[in-house]
Amino acid sequence: GINNMNILLTILVTFFAGMGAGLGTGFAGMSAAAVISPMLITFLGMDPYMAVGIALSSDVLASAVSAYTYGKNKNLDVKNGLIMMVSVLAFTVVGSYVSSLVPAATMGNFSVFMTFLLGIKFIVRPVMTTKEAMQGVSAGKRAAQSVICGVLIGFICGFIGAGGGMMMLLILTSVLGYELKTAVGTSVFIMAFTAFTGAASHFAIGGAPDWTVLILCVLFTLIWARIAAVFANKATPKTLNRATGVILVLLGIVVTIRVITDRGQTKDRISVAEAENELEEATGVSLKLDGAY
């Protein structure tokens, strides 16, 4: 009986985790790690290190399939995406290094709060930039902007250790004046690569994952990300802004509740923040990029 219960619980938890993560990825270019890892840790009692590795693995395919969907609908700028990715990766390392020199620069629940605020912003003040306005900027200027934004995003993620997907969406829409679909498309494109490096380093350090949980998470996240991405590309800007906003607000609330309930529990289970610090010492970079928390 116990085994069947366990399997059922595993399927339920991974299904809802994958659903939240997939919708977040496909709609908002949000990292799956923010949803999947807390759920695996809380409900399946999984080791935080492995949970983050599994979450990042789920991110890889979900982001890739979302990027493909956005790309097919001409909502992805591959060249500038690549330029930005290189600068994000480089400056995450710089940010990490600088933050190691400055004591106590972590802002633990910063990204949860940010997710929530960003969600509200999309509902209240939708991003209504058009593609035409976006393409009015010369190619050279766009490339230069991509570098500068990559540097900004990377440095902030490295320094604070939070909010990769969120920072990207915020900076792309508000600073670079990207139209929302292109911003999400670019964000998931970059995330597919950063999550891959993160996942690879996790399994290299922490050993093989729980394959059942990994496969279920990857599968469910992939399915929901594809559904969300197809819907997002068909939607009008206003609808998309609202949908993105609602999903971000919901994810923010869910993770916040978890942070609060987690405080009250026994201290013997490592807090997510501590697990992250250990991870960051071990991998140097991977987590901060993906901005899991």
Where are these regions (language model features)?
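Juxtamembrane transmembrane-helix boundary motif
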Residues: 1-23, 37, 41-43, 48, ...
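Alpha-helical transmembrane segments of polytopic integral membrane proteins
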Residues: 37, 57, 61-64, 116, ...
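Membrane-interface alpha-helices at helix entry/exit sites of multi-pass transporters
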Residues: 46-54, 79-80, 177-188
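A small-residue-rich subset of transmembrane alpha-helices
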Residues: 58, 186-202, 212-225
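Transmembrane helix-bundle signature of multi-pass membrane transporters/permeases
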Residues: 22, 52-60, 89, 184-195, ...
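Transmembrane helix boundary and interhelical junction motifs in multipass membrane proteins
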Residues: 27-36, 161-171
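Short, structured loop/turn "capping" segments at alpha-beta junctions
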Residues: 130-131, 162-167, 178-182
